[in-house]
A protein has these predicted regions:
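C-terminal output helix
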Residues: 107-118, 124
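The feature encodes the CheY-like receiver
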Residues: 58, 76
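Conserved acidic carboxylate
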Residues: 10
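Two-component/phosphorelay signaling modules centered on CheY-like receiver
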Residues: 13-31
Length: 125
């Protein structure tokens, strides 16, 4: 079976490094980005199976990136796990464009992996 590709958009380098190490230890291909502009420029070419995205990025709001993703027919189906230290699931799911799942920071590694495997089942890749 081919390795699954996971795109992580997170501005905190320590969190990005931890998520990358965890996912690579589970045999995923991981690409990490620090800025929303990088996401917009590279998401189509990366063609991820799952996206993990922080809501609060230095150059944009992750919810704006999610709207951009959902508007692009070629990648609109990609499952997205939003993460945030400032929002909780109740507040986040009230937004008009909800992600496939949400996780508050700091997070539990087992919970992160459970959510990723559940999202991979949704992925059409």
């Amino acid at each position: 079976m081919a390795k699954k590709n996971i795109l992580v958009v997170e501005d905190n380098h320590a969190i990005l490094d931890v998520i990358t190490l965890i996912l690579e230890s589970e045999a995923f291909n991981v690409v990490g980005l620090n800025k929303g502009a990088d996401f917009i420029n590279h998401v189509n070419e990366l063609n991820p199976d799952v996206i993990i995205m922080d809501i609060m990025l230095p150059d944009t709001d992750g919810r704006i990136l999610l709207k951009h993703l959902r508007a692009d027919v070629s990648i609109a189906h990609t499952p997205v796990l939003m993460i945030s230290a400032r929002y909780n699931a109740t507040n986040y799911m009230l937004d008009e464009v909800a992600a496939d799942d949400f996780m508050a920071k700091p997070f539990n590694i087992d919970e992160l992996m459970d959510k990723i495997y559940a999202l991979l089942k949704k992925s059409s890749h």
